[in-house]
């Protein structure tokens, strides 16, 4: 399979039995998805992990879109109703209320938005409004899923330290 674009979200100590015991080892394994001359979007990550991925990308002539450099996002709203402000790819999107709960979803949405904007030239129906609508309507059962309003009852399937930290932050 030849991708049109690749994305690597944050790097955390997860699946260490398969990917490695350090962030650098895990980053190296995740960089395995990079393909020669195919652009890649990197989420916010540990500087050491990012250096590893940047080295692998340079070796494959992979154009990178990096959090905080080629694009950025500001967090707003509340944990149950996060609001994204995005700047990147020559565009600005303000006050996008995400369908997914959790402030960490702002980072995930910014990655997805960057990927989608890069694909617009290949997919004419992938308009700015369609992308924003998708972010607003997205749902993920089991991820900060509201089961009851009164009293408030939430369910989450966090299973690693990074996921648990995001859950606590929410």
Segment roles from a protein language model:
Residues 1-7, 11-12, 16, 25, ...:
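Nucleotide phosphate-binding/pyrophosphate-handling subdomain across enzymes
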Residues 1-48:
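Flexible active-site lid/hinge loop adjacent to a nucleotide/diphosphate
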Residues 1-18, 50-93:
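Extended acidic/charged loop-beta regions that coordinate divalent cations
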Residues 31, 35, 55-63, 118-124, ...:
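Generic secondary-structure signature for well-ordered alpha-helical cores
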Residues 39, 63-65, 152:
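Conserved beta-strand segments of alpha/beta enzyme cores
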Residues 43, 67-69, 147:
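Conserved beta-strand termini and adjacent loop/short-helix elements that scaffold enzyme active sites
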Residues 46, 70-73, 100-102, 159:
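Glycine-rich beta-alpha junction loops
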């Amino acid at each position: 399979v030849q991708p049109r674009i690749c994305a690597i979200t944050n790097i955390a100590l997860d699946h260490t039995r398969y990917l490695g015991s350090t962030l650098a080892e895990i980053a190296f394994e995740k960089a395995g998805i990079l393909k020669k001359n195919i652009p890649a979007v990197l989420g916010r990550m540990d500087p050491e992990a990012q250096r590893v991925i940047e080295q692998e990308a340079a070796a494959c002539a992979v154009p990178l879109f990096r959090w905080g450099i080629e694009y950025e996002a500001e967090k707003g709203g509340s944990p149950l109703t996060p609001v994204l402000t995005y700047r990147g790819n020559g565009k600005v999107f303000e006050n996008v209320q995400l369908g997914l709960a959790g402030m960490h979803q702002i980072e995930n949405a910014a990655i997805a938005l960057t990927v989608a904007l890069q694909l617009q030239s290949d997919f004419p129906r992938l308009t700015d409004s369609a992308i924003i609508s998708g972010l607003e309507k997205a749902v993920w059962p089991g991820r900060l899923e509201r089961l009851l309003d009164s009293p408030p009852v939430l369910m989450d399937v966090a299973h690693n330290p990074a996921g648990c930290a995001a859950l606590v932050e929410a």
